[in-house]
Amino acid sequence: EPGYQIPFRHLCNYVQIYSGDTEKVLSRLSDATESQKERLRVRIECAKAWLRDYAPEEFKFSLQTENDALYEANENEIKAIRDFCGYVENYLDKMDEREFSNYIYQAASDNGLENADFFRVIYTVLIGKEKGPKLAGFVKACGSETIVPILKRY
């Protein structure tokens, strides 16, 4: 049986999204067979080691929690965050990342924000950094159940 196909970078993102919890990472890869999951466990351990020992700082992230300080957003940014939250709630789990990316740009343009500024705001809100993994894919990997509570803080 062939190994489960997931790019190492994506696997590293899952490891960070789920704070290194191997079983939660595997639960997101629900189409993997049991034998593939055994091999994935080894790859997950390799990803953890790479993140710990070799990953550049800009590659590392952790999702914000209720204990983290809120980003000081202006009125338009708050409206854009709330619009984006609505799009995540209503559409994220119903479409692929390419389709969903249109809603990212819509949340920015509907609130008078340049795309680059909106991306900076959303990354800061989600991971406390101005840049991060490709946004649509990252949000899709996290899932609405993870992203919505963070966005609803605003």
Where are these regions (language model features)?
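Feature 926 captures the class I aminoacyl-tRNA synthetase adenylation module centered on the KMSKS loop
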Residues: 1-95, 99-111, 118, 152
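Amphipathic alpha-helical/coiled-coil segments positioned at domain termini
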Residues: 105, 111-150
